[in-house]
Amino acid sequence: GLLGLGYGGYGYGAALAAPAAVSYAAPAIAAAPAVSYAAPAIAAAPAISYAAPAIAAAPAISYAAPAIAAAPAVSYAAPAIAAAPAISYAAAPALRYAAAPAIRYAAPAVARVAPAISYAAVAVARVAPAVSYAAPALSYARYAAPAVSYAAPALSYAAPALSYAAPAIAKYALH
């Protein structure tokens, strides 16, 4: 089932939907059962809450924009892109793609996908097996469960596999 969390009050527009477990609206977000994010306000999920530029940190994750707290697993920096195993990155015009089962992504800047994790952003640099982020373009985030879903002005991320897409991402940290 899809859990829709609309953030139209923040001036965000069209919604993007993923099959089965995840749905997204970029830049606004409708979240799957696991994780949802929205900007610029903050709503806290059972484990984590985020604020930009300030941070409220849960036991596992903290985010800040433009400042970044990096976890031991994954970090990103703009504008170069380096891909870790099972991860692919691409920035440029690609509006929609499907990666892992039951996951669909749509964002202004997405180009290619890897088996388990895929990233796409105008500014992405480094990745590790786990995932974490924080970026100037990431106003607000809410993390909820084992799966993860993100959306900044143009960022979307999904559960069974990981997927990112945003026009401006500086760094991320999640563990």
Swiss-Prot record:
Single GO molecular function: structural constituent of cuticle
Sequence repeats: 17-20, 25-28, 31-34, 38-41, 44-47, 51-54, 57-60, 64-67, 70-73, 77-80, 83-86, 91-94, 99-102, 106-109, 134-137, 144-147, 151-154, 158-161, 165-168
Assigned keywords, A-Z: Cuticle, Repeat
UniProt remark on domains: The tetrapeptide (A-A-P-[AV]) repeats found throughout the protein are also present in many proteins constituting the protective envelope of other species.
Function: Component of the cuticle of migratory locust which contains more than 100 different structural proteins.
The protein, known as: Cuticle protein 16.5, isoform B
Organism: Locusta migratoria (Migratory locust)
